[in-house]
Amino acid sequence: MRSKYIVIEGLEGAGKTTARNVVVETLEQLGIRDMVFTREPGGTQLAEKLRSLVLDIKSVGDEVITDKAEVLMFYAARVQLVETVIKPALANGTWVIGDRHDLSTQAYQGGGRGIDQHMLATLRDAVLGDFRPDLTLYLDVTPEVGLKRARARGELDRIEQESFDFFNRTRARYLELAAQDKSIHTIDATQPLEAVMDAIRTTVTHWVKELDA
């Protein structure tokens, strides 16, 4: 079976780390053990520096990061990760499990920030071409639930400190995009943890078995 790229998406506090662990466990039970893990922004030395710039509220002092500058930093980090880590791993037969990818930008910057969606799509296509994840698990939570969980973890980053309205717009865009793309599977992450884990196991298992069919 050809190696695949699986991405886990969702608002802050959606449970992406737990979901990743369930995905890994499920794939291993299906006989897939050669995997690497990525996060966005980040995953390379350059991309991690960009992550610090875009998420650390103190990284640029009092200077305000403009919405378009934010988008371009995300894409700079993304293309570096894709070209130097993800594509080589896939070519080597290694599965890639990612914490966020381009759907985050389409939702957060397109929905939350209100940046023109055509511009974002054009930028995506120019930077990534036709490269897309094979499977995306979108963990759907309300901002109220997600941010409560995120705040319980400790200090919030620059984006996590945005308003509920911002996250409501982001969630709405996530749901809109998920409804348009069959490769995106929505998981109700407001359920009890065991139910969420079961839904992830079932989705991944069925998807992998369909690949073998």
UniProtKB/Swiss-Prot annotation:
This protein's pathway: Pyrimidine metabolism; dTTP biosynthesis
PANTHER family: THYMIDYLATE KINASE, UMP-CMP KINASE 2, MITOCHONDRIAL
Record region (LID): 147-159
Organism: Escherichia coli (strain K12)
Protein name as it appears in the record: Thymidylate kinase
Binding locations of ATP: G10, L11, E12, G13, A14, G15, K16, T17
Function noted in UniProt: Catalyzes the reversible phosphorylation of deoxythymidine monophosphate (dTMP) to deoxythymidine diphosphate (dTDP), using ATP as its preferred phosphoryl donor. Situated at the junction of both de novo and salvage pathways of deoxythymidine triphosphate (dTTP) synthesis, is essential for DNA synthesis and cellular growth.
GO molecular function: ATP binding; dTMP kinase activity; protein homodimerization activity
Residues noted as binding dTMP in the record, renumbered to the chain: E12, F74, R78, R100, T105, Y108, Q109
Summary of subunit composition and partner proteins: Homodimer.
Catalysed conversion reaction: dTMP + ATP = dTDP + ADP
HAMAP family: Thymidylate_kinase
Domain of life: Bacteria
UniProt gene name: tmk
Family: Belongs to the thymidylate kinase family.
Keywords of this entry: ATP-binding, Kinase, Nucleotide biosynthesis, Nucleotide-binding, Transferase
Keyword ATP-binding among record annotations: yes
